[in-house]
Amino acid sequence: MAKYLSGANFVGNFTIEGQSDKLPKPEAYTISKCEKLPQPDMYRLTARIKYGDIDSEVPLDLKILWAGGTPVITMDAFWIPGMGTFGARVLIHANRYSGTWQHDEVGGHLFGVIKKD
C-alpha cells in the first residue's frame, strides 16, 4: 500500500450535501510519500491538499483498513492543521477513489481518478 500511494495524485471532485443544484467542485491530493507506521493499519501520508482556497502540504497519520482486498482510508474526528476537523471514508479501487467526507456539520461525497507520475 505504501508503494502504491507514494507519488499518487488523486484528482477529482467533491459534492456538498444539500447543494444538489450545484456542480461538484474540483479537488486534488498529491501524496509525495506514504510509509507504514508501527501501529496496526496506520500509515503516514505526506500529502498536498488542494480544494477551494486551500493549498497545503501536511503529514497525515491515517488508518487504512481493508474491506476484503479493497483499501479504505479512514478518518474519524481527524484534525488537519489550518483546515479543521474531518471525518472520511475513501475507498480505492482500479485507480479510482470514492467516498464520503465530513467537516463539522458539512459533508458530502468525493470521487475521482488516481494517477501516478
Regions found by a protein language model. Name each.
Residues 4-117:
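Central antiparallel beta-sheet cores of small beta-barrel/beta-sandwich binding domains
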